[in-house]
Amino acid sequence: MNSANSALVLFSGGQDSTTCLAWALTHYARVETIGFDYGQRHAIELAVRPFLLEKMRLISPEWDGRLGADHMIDLSLIAKISNTALTSNVEIAMLENGLPNTFVPGRNLLFMTVAATVAYRRGLDVLVGGMCETDFSGYPDCRDDTMKALQVTLNLGMATKLKVETPLMWIDKAATWKMAQDLGGTPLLNLVRTGTHTCYLGERGELHDWGYGCGNCPACKLRARGYADFIAG
C-alpha cells in the first residue's frame, strides 16, 4: 500500500484510464474517479463509464471497498474554443506543426487543474492519469516533462503536496494490455477489451479481437497493434 492513501483517477472510459483505475485500486485505500464532458466526438466513452465502474467493483471485493465517488465535470467550453478532429466532424489529418488534428490544445492542462481542484476539496493525495510518452501521437500535454511541471505548478498554486502518477508513461500498448492482465487477471483483461472505448470516431458496432472501434483511426490502430503484440508475447 502506498504511503499516500487516496487517489483521484482521471477516468474517461478508455483502455488506458481503466487500466490506471485498476492500478490505483491496487495501490491506494481510497480511490475516486473524475470524467470530463468536453464535447468530444467519441462521447460513447462517457456512456460506458458507469458500466465499467460497476464491473470493476465485481472483479475484486477489495476494489469494491476502495472505490468511492465518481465526479463528472462539464468542460464543454473546450469544444467552443477549439476546432479539432476530436471535437468536430472533420477528417483526421496531420497539421503543418507536425501534430495530428486530434490534438486538443490545453485539454490535459485543464483536466489536471480541475482534477486537482476536486482532489483538494475531497482531501485526496494523488492524481492518476493515463498519459503516455511511449505509444502516443506526439501530444505535448502527454509528456513526462509536462506532468512534472504541472505537479509543481498545481502545488505552488494551491499550497498542497499533491502527487501526479502516470503508470503508463514509459510503457507501450502491449505492456498496457499486460498490466491489465497482471492487475485483474482475465476478468479485467476481458473488461478492458470489450467494455472500454478508444475509437476517435465513436464507432461501437463491431467487436474485434482487441475491442470495439472503426479499426482505421490512429487510436484503433494503436490499440489493435498493441493487442496483437501482447497476444504474440
UniProtKB/Swiss-Prot annotation:
Chain segments annotated as transmembrane: none
Superkingdom per UniProt: Bacteria
Cross-referenced Pfam families: QueC
Binding site for Zn(2+): 199, 214, 217, 220
Coiled coil ranges: none
Catalytic activity: 7-carboxy-7-deazaguanine + NH4(+) + ATP = 7-cyano-7-deazaguanine + ADP + phosphate + H2O + H(+)
Note describing how the cofactor binds: Binds 1 zinc ion per subunit.
HAMAP family: QueC
Function: Catalyzes the ATP-dependent conversion of 7-carboxy-7-deazaguanine (CDG) to 7-cyano-7-deazaguanine (preQ(0)).
Family: Belongs to the QueC family.
Protein name from the UniProt record: 7-cyano-7-deazaguanine synthase
Native source organism of the sequence: Herminiimonas arsenicoxydans
Gene: queC
